Amino acid sequence: MHFMTALRAAWQQRDSLLCVGLDPDPARFPAHLQGRPDAIFEFCAAIVDATADLVCSFKPQIAYFAARRAEDQLEALIDHIHAHHPGVPVILDAKRGDIGSTAEQYAVEAFERFKADAITVNPYMGRDSVDPYLAYPDKGVILLCRTSNPGGSDLQFLDVGGEKLYERVARLVAEDWNASGNCGLVVGATFPAEIARVRALTGEMPLLVPGIGAQGGDIEATVKAGRTAAGGGLMINSSRAILYAGKGEDFAAAARAAALQTRDAINAYR
């Protein structure tokens, strides 16, 4: 299934704009999982199973797996999501950016090895560094645009021919790079004015919006700035506030409660 088709169906069928980020930190796992060789998979799978009916997507961050030699557990996790929660797209948060020949290998890694439905990509090196991902027309390619971190303004607010760099990225992606209709953009919840600007430049293109929860982004401002006329168009990510809502053996139930609260808070402004 095309990533965008799956995403739109998830928005409607699950009545949700919530994306749960899977950033597993074993130091924060409950005691009963500590020291287990499969702890990362078990923790993430429990979160997934507890929240899948409340989300429009899951977003595993590859560094949290690779740093602990747990890429095999990431493969197993994505297989688990596809097998047990079909229709919930998986975004591999990798933020790759390299020359074409290397990007080809990163695309194979994301879409053929891990079988992700979408990947986050850094557009800084230009179109030829993104083409290998775009060559998979049924997969989502979500490009960094206006990121949620404070230092994003160092480059993203630079003037380039009368517009800010993040605006140029948004316009390029919407007008030139999205021939297969499989592109999206990353725009941080910490900057609602920029969310509104990107929405104006890109029409109904999906926006992946990190920065609520632990990073302090405002849900009401985010939704009002970025929603489409139909009340969709957003994947609003929350990671730590959901993953670590509980510390005991009932951590998955606590994560579900946090996800439900977040989803409903988002829906209040759709």
UniProtKB/Swiss-Prot annotation:
Pathway(s) of this molecule: Pyrimidine metabolism; UMP biosynthesis via de novo pathway; UMP from orotate: step 2/2
SUPFAM superfamilies: Ribulose-phoshate binding barrel
Enzyme Commission number(s) from the entry: 4.1.1.23
Keywords: Decarboxylase, Lyase, Pyrimidine biosynthesis
Pfam families (UniProt xref): OMPdecase (PF00215)
Gene Ontology BP, a term: 'de novo' pyrimidine nucleobase biosynthetic process
Active site: K95
GO terms of molecular function: orotidine-5'-phosphate decarboxylase activity
Catalytic reaction equation(s): orotidine 5'-phosphate + H(+) = UMP + CO2
Gene3D superfamilies named among the record's database cross-references: Aldolase class I (3.20.20.70)
Protein name: Orotidine 5'-phosphate decarboxylase
Gene: pyrF
